[in-house]
Structures are given as structure tokens and as C-alpha cells.
């Protein structure tokens, strides 16, 4: 069965949103991304130095150089921001850059008390995403 490689074959921008904990646990994926050089790939890492979504355990995210790691595995552009003005400027710059691009957004630990939770299961999300990709392949 032929697999669709959405970043390599698609002209649309692909945005991957990660936390620093996930990036650290799956760092090998950055090397694969760098080696494949997808021009439409933007990797946004929210770095708060913690596994916030699963209890707030500390990570080394704020102690290591994630942009330097991205450069060393051949990301074409890297950015770090820590405030809204910097984010707005970088987002306009990213639109003109070829990927892979890393955007590290340094954020505070914690979340809003009124933050909603997902209403669909992971399997439902997977099936909806697969259906979306199949629809796009037919067009």
C-alpha cells in the first residue's frame, strides 16, 4: 500500500505543534526532518521546561539549545521568541522561509483554568485526519 507523505508531496504549509518534553523524548524525529528537507514544514515548540500536560514534571528544555540542535540537523531556519511582539514579527518572516523551520516559543508553565478538553477520542481524530488526507488525494 502506498503511503502519503504529506510534507514532501504537499504544497501547503504543514505546522507541527510540540512541547519541549515531546521534542526531547522524540529528538530523533528532528534529524529525520532535517535529512528530508521538507520545504513546507514548520515545527513550533512551546518550551516551558516542563511536561505540563501530564503533571508538570521538569524537563531540560530551558537548559539546552533547541535551536542549535535544529541547526545541527539541517533545519533551514530557526527562531526563538519569548513575547507577543517577537512572535508576530517571526510569523511574518516564516511565511517567506523555506523549511524545515523551527520556532521555539518560550512560555510560562501552567494553563488557563477554563481551558476546555478534547471532546473526541484519539481514534476519532486519527480517522478524521486520514479521511481528510484521502479527500485531498482525490482532488
Walk through the language-model features, giving the residues of each.
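Short secondary-structure boundary segments
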Residues: 45, 82, 105-107
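Generic beta-sheet signal
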Residues: 12-16, 41, 97-105
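Glycine/aspartate-rich loop-and-adjacent alpha/beta segment that forms the canonical ThDP
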Residues: 97-139
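Conserved thiamine diphosphate
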Residues: 13-93
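Short active-site-adjacent structural elements
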Residues: 52-54, 89-90, 110-116
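Short, small-residue-biased leader/transition segments that mark boundaries at the very start
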Residues: 1-8
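Short, structured coil segments at secondary-structure junctions
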Residues: 10, 37, 73-74
Amino acid at each position: 500500500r502506498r503511503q502519503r507523505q504529506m510534507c514532501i508531496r504537499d504544497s501547503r504549509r504543514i505546522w507541527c505543534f510540540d512541547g519541549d518534553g515531546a521534542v526531547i523524548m522524540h529528538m530523533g524525529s528532528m534529524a529525520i526532518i532535517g535529512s528530508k528537507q521538507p520545504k513546507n514544514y514548520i515545527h513550533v515548540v512551546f518550551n516551558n521546561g516542563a511536561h505540563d500536560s501530564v503533571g508538570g514534571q521538569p524537563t531540560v528544555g530551558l537548559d539546552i539549545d533547541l535551536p542549535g540542535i535544529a541547526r545541527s540537523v539541517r533545519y533551514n531556519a530557526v527562531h526563538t521568541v519569548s513575547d507577543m511582539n517577537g512572535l508576530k514579527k517571526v510569523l511574518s518572516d516564516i511565511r517567506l522561509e523555506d523549511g524545515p523551520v523551527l520556532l521555539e516559543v518560550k512560555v510560562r508553565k501552567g494553563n488557563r483554568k477554563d481551558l476546555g478538553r478534547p471532546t473526541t477520542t484519539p481514534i476519532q481524530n486519527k480517522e478524521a485526519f486520514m479521511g481528510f488526507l484521502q479527500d485531498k488525494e482525490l482532488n
